[in-house]
Amino acid sequence: MSRILVDTSVWIDHLRSSDELLVTLLNNHRVLMHSMIWGELACGHLRHRLQILTLLKHLPHLSEATHDEVMTFMDNKQLMGRGIGFVDVHLLAATVLTPGARIWTRDSRLSAVAQSLEIAWHSD
């Protein structure tokens, strides 16, 4: 059973209105965290900010790539000009580096690239 890196887009929706599937994944210890996602969420306005950030920080983390590794990954996979940003490439690289990991996102461009890399996870 794969473990899932839950992208910022999914977390934002969940924090606005509870996502049953995400709750199930959390309860089954299948959710992974990346420091970039944690940081993106920390930049926003969060109700119960300290509590949420503490809980998220203590989720299992993926193996994270260095900036140099991400640049090499971007070049090797030809991810330039595909409509995703550097943080997204970090998430993709970390997902590839972590055996059995998949990424769940609601961002259409990130999802398309994840699908092309065969690391996308879909809720349906």
Feature annotation, model-predicted:
Residues M1-M33, A42-T54:
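Short, well-structured N-terminal submotif of metal-dependent ribonuclease cores
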Residues E20, H61-D124:
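Active-site neighborhoods of divalent-metal-dependent phosphate/nucleic-acid chemistry enzymes
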